[in-house]
Amino acid sequence: MSVISILPLASKSCLYKSLMSSTHELKALCRPIATLGMCRRGKSVMASKSTSLTTAVSDDGVQRRIGDHHSNLWDDNFIQSLSSPYGASSYGERAERLIGEVKEIFNSLSRTDGELVSHVDDLLQHLSMVDNVERLGIDRHFQTEIKVSLDYVYSYWSEKGIGSGRDIVCTDLNTTALGFRILRLHGYTVFPDVFEHFKDQMGRIACSDNHTERQISSILNLFRASLIAFPGEKVMEEAEIFSATYLKEALQTIPVSSLSQEIQYVLQYRWHSNLPRLEARTYIDILQENTKNQMLDVNTKKVLELAKLEFNIFHSLQQNELKSVSRWWKESGFPDLNFIRHRHVEFYTLVSGIDMEPKHCTFRLSFVKMCHLITVLDDMYDTFGTIDELRLFTAAVKRWDPSTTECLPEYMKGVYTVLYETVNEMAQEAQKSQGRDTLSYVRQALEAYIGAYHKEAEWISSGYLPTFDEYFENGKVSSGHRIATLQPTFMLDIPFPHHVLQEIDFPSKFNDFACSILRLRGDTRCYQADRARGEEASCISCYMKDNPGSTQEDALNHINNMIEETIKKLNWELLKPDNNVPISSKKHAFDINRGLHHFYNYRDGYTVASNETKNLVIKTVLEPVPM
């Protein structure tokens, strides 16, 4: 049960060839498929259909389970017709000029005509500037300037925090909370005890009962800071509970405004399920509203102008990449397999939502292809394939030799061929950036993944319900996080020598925690639909088995607590001081986890493309922002 459910092929995919190479093979394939209503021709049979499962018996006596998934929502002709004017060189030239102007704004924060800016709020100005460019998704242009600003702020950091300016003796909560979050995310050593100095005699964060905009902003920054917690930081737990409660109450009393929109977004997506591109789009809209109300200064307007232009330039690139993805999907022959979910557009939305660097095209495309392959395998192992067929396929993946697949059913031959060719092609491309062969790493991860799938298929076939620990250890592998992350990561222009892989891949704590979060969160969103498809084993059902008398609510509470603690552990693995593995080497794997978590924030956003998922595709991929 996968929670996830690079190069374009030069010609029609081998799956299509496998389907159409001979009349005999076509009939052999259509016998089971046509009887299940998945081909336009063939015999019909009696079928029983539940809310999310169709079972049918073919005329050769084979009974198969099929998830009742909705079809692809995004027409290929529509995707191929997309166009954008923002790919023109004139827009890129305008962006370069604006980048230079924003760099000058950064520099002016330190000096203006040889004099330092106001000592009253210079620290807050530095932090706000960094916060703005990061939330707007344009920080990649200003890494040097950000480092200078944060070094400056950190030089005034104390155990009691900081004030708004270098000469302000009294520390304030707003600047301290904003500084804590940004400094911690950039690898500076800061401790949460700093927030103890903002408590009253009752041990609570000191604030008035009046919901002033200044106070709300301070508590909002405290909430954002509390989400970057490490294990055992009780102060951060208390800050999160207090600030979340305060902000929810504030929403009931303040009018609808840019501030209320910001609060709603942060409460909804927090940090670990936040997509950077969605945040950029949301923050652009918020600042645009402030512009209409004449609430922005000249510098922020300049930053906003660059953010909108950059958003739309990348939007033009997204359309071209999405066309490539859609062509690959169509040529692969997967649209002819109607028992699988077709979610390539959603996968692309996810990956382009976490990586907006134009040069990382192969990373994005390989992620989409790997995730779609995972989804095909998931649907094949969970529902359509018989246990005997799956045993043959599992053995074939271990052999990794397409010449030895004659024993497979025709539909499996096609799936195997696309899997084999796509993985090998991506490994060849990865060799260019890594300078070595990475196929052995990916094959090992793929074999482990298929093995975990196979074990779950055996459980389904035999009706076995494992213990929680047995299910969870296997489920971390079958979540698909590792295999979805590993191959695309090799496509980056970042070297991943063996000692770095040991820190982010199996069996590292980083990999274990990332897989754990995805398995746990996925099960809380999917367990009811999985049970309807005949998949009894889940974290919920296995917990209840181990704890007789417990309810689903008990199980969900236990698992949600596990998720919260594991997120803190993953935060630590990302941000802990480590000279051997810089944050940049871990960041893409971490952000993939955030993106996948986003799609399971409230529901299974893959299997069922809700209005929220559709709106995400529209807002972050299909539509530009108004200039």
From Swiss-Prot:
GO molecular function annotations of the record: lyase activity; magnesium ion binding; terpene synthase activity
Note describing how the cofactor binds: Binds 3 Mg(2+) or Mn(2+) ions per subunit.
Enzyme Commission number(s) of this protein: 4.2.3.107
Record-listed Mg(2+) 3 binding positions: 530
Domain of life of the organism encoding this protein: Eukaryota
InterPro entries noted in UniProt: Isoprenoid_synthase_dom_sf (IPR008949), Terpene_cyclase-like_1_C (IPR034741), Terpene_cyclase_plant_C1 (IPR044814), Terpene_synth_N (IPR001906), Terpene_synth_N_sf (IPR036965), Terpene_synthase-like (IPR050148), Terpene_synthase_metal-bd (IPR005630), Terpenoid_cyclase/PrenylTrfase (IPR008930)
Motif (DDXXD motif): 378-382
Annotated keywords: Chloroplast, Lyase, Magnesium, Manganese, Metal-binding, Plastid, Transit peptide
Principal location listed in the UniProt entry: plastid
Binding residues for Mg(2+) 2: 378, 382
Compartment annotation: Plastid, Chloroplast
Phosphoprotein keyword on record: no
Reactions that this protein is recorded to catalyse: (2E)-geranyl diphosphate = (+)-car-3-ene + diphosphate
Presequence boundaries: 1-36
Keyword Translocase annotated: no
GO CC term (a single one): chloroplast
GO biological process, one term: cellular response to jasmonic acid stimulus
Chain residues that bind Mg(2+) 1: 378, 382
Pathway as given in its UniProt record: Terpene metabolism; oleoresin biosynthesis
Cofactor annotation: Mg(2+); Mn(2+)
Induction of expression: By jasmonic acid (MeJA).
Purpose of the protein: Terpene synthase (TPS) involved in defensive oleoresin formation in conifers in response to insect attack or other injury.
Family: Belongs to the terpene synthase family. Tpsd subfamily.
Protein name: Carene synthase, chloroplastic
Organism: Picea abies
